[in-house]
């Protein structure tokens, strides 16, 4: 109940990166997904996002958690199915650290509000499980 109360007072919920479960693939993401599927917590998060104009941010394993929960790409916490989008190991089977080029197509985010629409930005990316897989 203390966690639900904390969410009800928050403006943003942030899922941090980091490793747990002996660095098992998606270890932290699995933990976050399990905790946030609790009905009271789920309801509190959805009220934050839908009724209070709250924000969600996920870094590293935290972004994996957003995908596992369904917040990305669906905008709501949903149960995973066999066809659910996921992040998985890179095709080369190891960590990748490189610059990627990203086109900003919307600035409907406080993190992108000063970005120039349709401009391409070079940004750093570093991950071992960064391959996004989704069915059509």
Task: Please describe what each predicted stretch is.
Residues 2-9, 42-49, 78-136:
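Amide-donor transfer/coupling interface in amidating biosynthetic enzymes
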Residues 1-57, 63-76, 81:
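Flexible gly/pro-rich beta->alpha loop and the following alpha-helix that scaffold active-site loops
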Residues 16-18, 59-62, 69, 100, ...:
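Fold-independent oxyanion-binding glycine-rich loops
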